[in-house]
Amino acid sequence: MKNEKTYKIGTLTYTTTGIILLSIWMLWGDLIWSLKDRAVGPSSTLLFKQIIDSEFLYGLIIIAFPNFTNIFLQPIIGFVSDRHRGRLGRRIPFILFTTPFIVLGLYGLAFTKLFGSWLHGVCPSLSLSAAQLIFFGISWVFLDFGSTLAASLFTALANDVIPREVIGRMFGLFRLVSLGVGMFYNYCLIGKVESHTMWIFFGVGTAYGLGLLLLCLKVKEGKYPPPEELPPLPNGKKRTILQTVTTNSVIYFRQSFSMAYYRWFIVATVIANLAFMPINGFSIQYSKALGIPTDDYGKYVVFSYCISLFLSYFLGVLSDKFHPLRTGIASQLVYAVLMFAGFFIMINPKAFSYIFILHVVISGCFFTFVASLNSRILPQGIFAQFISAIGIVSAAFNMIAGPVIGKIIDVAGDYRYTLLLSALISTASVLLLYKVYRDFLKYGGDKNYEAPMPE
């Protein structure tokens, strides 16, 4: 036992047994988060399309609105949680805070049709679709508020408690769990969403509430150095609330965006993630336009997830070995070629099945490769703050991109343009990631890299 290998991160020390137990509970948390994440997107899309058929409104409400709230909410939660020191740690208290909002939002979506029908009966001048859209919107606001705040917290918690020696593998396992949940949803549930909306959303909401509570009880954070204190005012005066908010905002934006290295990294990360939005956001509608049954669409997803499931752990190992920047660039390059080719050939159900499966597999490879990239590049002391800064820029891009893509499809009447857009964005991401890679080498590369700390 004396020679048992130990793993350290901050004040936390794990034996091999401890790492296994940590892995179990973090994977449990990822299972619950993935269930919510995998189910909400497609289920909300199908529910929304049952209520009203407008790609512009879909892009505005489902895509643009969450990204608009990201701009304001993620910086707050990132900045505050980085500097919070409490009995339960700096991430877990905020995870607990967000959970009721997510559960209420999911329950609201479950009863959207029921409440909407009731409102239409009470107020006949309001159409049934408008009444249901009102309740959908209210529930979506609750769900979005909680999800936006929680999105970066789980990643930040993983960054705080998982030792660097195993973080790539751990994120590979996270990906494996996420894919498994996606397979279950798309094989067993997606074909039933339109007829069993209430039970699916209600079940996911209940599982999320109980599951996240258990995660917060079982995972323990370490001790953190005291946060940087605000400089004193002249004559020892106390700051007003407005002065405190203003000073913290200046610190936030200075630290997050003052260094060119991190500005390039943020933009590269955002553009790389944006490359998959055109297909991910409109693939269900594309399949329906080609006459593909929803069950068949779900089977394509399940098959592609089976491939990704097999690859996920090994991709994590490759990421640890070759660095996420290199593997991320390679996967984006392959994806760009696929999308350019797909634009010319994806014109019938058979072509859709092949290109869509490859899209899911290759985009999945990218996300697995770069899952630990933020932990390998960003300063640990203000990690969640940087994640939120990425979220701000990502939200700004996505907020514009969602409705624009929807409008392009409405005008062109052809979903094939989603592939061309993905190809162009992916090509841009390759160039941006290569720029970041060159700067990474200047700061020490694989052996001597230390994340530079902004002043």
Question: Where do the PLM segments sit?
Answer:
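Intracellular juxtamembrane helix-capping segments at the cytosolic ends
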Residues: 149-162, 365-379
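Helix-to-loop junctions at the C-terminal end of transmembrane segments
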Residues: 72-87, 311-324, 409-410
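C-terminal transmembrane helical hairpin of 12-TM major facilitator-type secondary transporters
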Residues: 325-367
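A membrane-interface helix-boundary motif in multi-pass transporters
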Residues: 90-92, 191-206, 407-426
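Helix-loop boundary and gating motifs at the non-cytosolic
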Residues: 3-69, 261-268, 272-290, 297
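Structural signature of the two symmetry-related core transmembrane helices
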Residues: 91-107, 326-341
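Juxtamembrane intracellular "pre-TM" segments in multi-pass secondary transporters
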Residues: 2-18, 226-265, 452-455
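Glycine-rich segments within core transmembrane alpha-helices of 12-TM secondary carriers
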Residues: 69-71, 168-190, 391-402
